[in-house]
Amino acid sequence: STENFNVKTDGRMDVSDALQEALNRTKQKENGCGILFIPEGVYKLSKTIYIPSGVRIIGYGGKRPVFVLAKQAPGFQEVTRETAKGKYLFWFIGGGYRPGGRIGDANAGTFYSSMMNVDIRIEDGNPNASAIRAHFAQHCSISNVTIHVGKGRAGIVDAGNHLENIAIYGGEYGIDTDKSAPGWPIMLLNSYFEGQRRSAILTNEGGLTIVRMRAKNVPVAIEIKENAPDRLFMEDCIFEDVHHTGVILTDAGNAATQINLRNIQCKNVPMFALERFTNKQVSGKGKTYRVTRFIFGFNADSLEDTPQIVRRVETEPIKNITPLDAGDTPMLPATEQWVNIRDLGAKGDGFSDDTHIFQEAVEKYANIYIPQGWYIVKEPLTLKQNTNLIGLHPGTTILLTLGGNLAFSGFGAPQAQLTTPQGGKNIVCGIFLNADAYNYRAVNCKWMAGEGSYMYDVKFSGHDKARFFHNGQSAVNPLEKPMSITPETHDLITRAWDNQHWSLWITNGGGGSFRDIWTANEYSSAGLYISHTDTPGRIYGMSLEHHLRNEAIFRNVANWKIYDFQFEVEAEGIDTQPLDLIDCKNLTFANFYSYRVSRMLKSYPSAIRTWNCKDIEFLNVHNYAHARVKFTSNASLYDVN
């Protein structure tokens, strides 16, 4: 916490150097990851603050802490080649920061970095200031942040993996982004933009997946840059007092352009859409109206349909704007209601057995806070109807079952490390579930909780190939120095691949919301398996990778919406099937991205296979390979029957 540094939080003392030093020290923690807690107060800044990879800034207190860029701070006025998108107040970087050293931008290998529960204000006299550069990858996020850009340039530049519950006021742009570092879609959930001078969002191949956005008092809500094909999905949004155009479009003649907008409420929006170059317009329908469906670009209405470029709009008049409902992503209970598992006796040292401490905590308490640590859990853990497990950093808050555990090995049915009850209203967040390598019956999580449940910011993996091995056996203490990789030890690792069950198993009526999930594990047969449920469910951003057989399987599933589904087929998964759908109906996939890495030496027949399915929608599909060969040798979707 910055309480450990000599800083004043009255907004008069420049704390730039102290804040940078605190971030640097946080980076030096075990695994190069950690949390810097920022107490309530006002923090004056005058220079760029570099946030190292794996480090999270989290504010706390009765009010959010506020970072303020001082008036006329040096360097935030002039536009140079290096500051064409603004000089950044906060810059997420790859690796650590060393004064005078080379600054490496956050990239496809930057994980876990985040900013949560803080506000930012840019004072006058900083016309080229941009609040945040966030070009990062999995489990990186900006969450519960309000940015007052004022007369500065932008709120967020080159966004990454996940943006949630953000509000941006002022600036030329709220968000100005190119594609994310891994080339995947960007999830923007529950956002508010007001008073931008050019547009709320400017995108250049950003692949934005936007749910519940409100843009007010701006010339343009969404602008796609010139000559740039893009995949834009929006649902349940509000445009209000948008003076010029709701959405500026470009390049419909490119098959890569796929725009799908649904349920966009408009008030005082005279022109909903404008196509650049051709000047084709979609005019508004009165003062207050709803765009129920808008399609622009490459489209096929059925498996038998020939894909073609379309422009299609459906509108209806409405009397009033209906407020957006974000009830499916509830806030955590107040911290005063949390019980710290360490206070109950858990060690989290990677050596001690914390199983019974967790079991007793579940019996007695509803809201269990799990601080950073390695918690050894040797038996299955089953939550009660209202149990919440709360972590704040999945890279450093690990529930680990070591290999060869009798409860998860041998013969028998799949056995979950963590199970939620049928119909439960559980919240599970900010933790890492790991069943090591040699646990043949292991499932990381069996989720049967109901529609009101919520999982987010959770990692599933055994992906660190060396971390959990020591002298040819699973490590007694995972914090021991990992073994060196030799031909013999490499064989030990690879023989464990694909021996466990699915990482996340949603079944028996399970549903609810799943946000910012990362499941990457060579040891599991699939990253996600959803089976036998018609309880409504929603996925807001999930990354699946490094599996050998399947990435995701849906069997007998109905009434789900999957936003921002991204698959990375890695070198060990040369014959991996990204998505199988079996006996499913009423599913929507929005911004579906699937790719094979550059190390692949052959194509694969299809990205999606279906059996006996109906009413399945794919709204924006990107199927590609960073390789010498294309992804599919057949088609993106293969209907087996």
Regions picked out by a protein language model, each given a short descriptive name:
Residues 1-641:
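Extracellular/periplasmic carbohydrate-active domains that bind, remodel
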